Amino acid sequence: MSNILRRGRLEAAQDEEILRYTSSMEADRWIFNADIVVDLAHTVMLREQGIIKEEDCSKILSGLLKIREEGMEKLDFSYEDIHISLESRLIDMVGEDVGGRMHSGRSRNDEVATCIRLTLREELLGLLEEIFALRKTLVSLAEKHSETLMPGFTHLQHAQPTTLAHHLCAHESALGRDFDRVQDAFSRVNLCPLGAAAFASTGFNLNRKRTQELLGFEGLLENSMDAVSSRDFLIECASVFSNLMINLSRIAEELVIWSSSEFNFIELDDMYASTSSIMPQKKNPDTAELMRGKTGVSVGALMSLLTICKGLPLSYNRDLQEATPNIWRSVETVRASVRVMEGMVKTMKVHPDVLAAESITGFTTATELADTFVRETGIPFRTAHQIVGMLAKEREKPTMEKIDSASEVVLGESLSSKGLTENMVKEALNPESNIKRRKIPGGPAPEEMKNYLSKRKTELELNAQEIATLKDIIDSAFENLLSVVEEYRKI
């Protein structure tokens, strides 16, 4: 059979090199199922609008279901994309007088935009579930370690005592924002461009609301020119994925550092480690290292999308074909990374004794000591900061005698004469006491962490309901579509 796309206007066939250069068939594997679903919905609507006959609709629908059953490998890969290849296969099965009517009132421009949105919508739903699982694992682990002391860091230097729960919840909080960003992006992806045709809509009396309903989209992307030419939703999603991967890379970096001999805070499960081909003692955190590296894939995809979409005039341009593979590569990477991270966190062994011992290394209680000077003696914080800084230079545990000596240099009088006692100093230098004092919202005090974790669990319950609602809407739409398809096949 001659090429159904080129036979009228173009005489020369494309040679293999040009075909390989222009073809999107490999990337279109991502949208094969979506294309079938979009064709089903469009065909149903064509019948309902009286644009095609009932018997033709029945044959087209049966042919499409047969193609879905056969799979993509049965299609002719000599076509430049999945849409024409699929239509060609349908025409082979039911004849052009029937199959050739399916594309009425439609262009590949609105078709591909709809397929991309349909597929990406499913990927975003899966990603929401996976982020949810990772957050839930972090919250569960935090509940077990609300009193597990550890050093907090700034500049990778020991800074102040905190708890492992507080640290884990910092990551969970960031992932919560990632979850929100994915939800926000979902709402803009979940719009239907079908019916926009090439860009100026169509003279056929299409019912765009009907195909929107059959495909489970939240609304229409109304302006037909914008509907086919815009890929800002891809850029938005790629940005969201990059942000998420950067947050995951921060956790991965800490897992690499914490599992080192120098830190020994945790041990990764063997499943997530490798060994050396020459050094038999090695247990390398390769999975976490790869996650850092794969962050570059997502960031690179975002940069590619921005560059491809820059400066394109309205409406559709073939450049956009090069945009789509970037989003599939990015979403595949980010979803796998979230799943792998959840497994690493869930299975890692925590070393509480090491964490507790390190919580006081490097004079981590210095801030609380300065705060105690302020609270108990009334001196300005900046003055207290200077006194404690002088004590820190000595690299020895501060005593009352050393404190008074330093304060006399700075103030000309001892702090003991202003009411400071040894018990106050002892309390200030105790990391557990440090943490218990930090009970304002967001602090690491066990009682505050209990309240915080309770709120996070409530939020997770709400998020679970939100995911379920989105899935139910889409599942119901597809069930309805398939029900209508089965009804219309019976002629």
UniProtKB/Swiss-Prot annotation:
It is an enzyme of class 4 (lyase). Its EC number is 4.3.2.1. Keywords: Amino-acid biosynthesis, Arginine biosynthesis, Cytoplasm, Lyase. GO terms for molecular function: argininosuccinate lyase activity. Its main location: cytoplasm. The keyword Magnesium does not apply. It is found in: Cytoplasm. GO terms for biological process: arginine biosynthetic process via ornithine; L-arginine biosynthetic process. Pathway: Amino-acid biosynthesis; L-arginine biosynthesis; L-arginine from L-ornithine and carbamoyl phosphate: step 3/3. It catalyses: 2-(N(omega)-L-arginino)succinate = fumarate + L-arginine. One of its GO terms (cellular component) is cytosol. The keyword Lyase applies. HAMAP family: Arg_succ_lyase. Belongs to the lyase 1 family. Argininosuccinate lyase subfamily. PANTHER family: ARGININOSUCCINATE LYASE. This is Argininosuccinate lyase. It comes from Methanosarcina mazei (strain ATCC BAA-159 / DSM 3647 / Goe1 / Go1 / JCM 11833 / OCM 88).
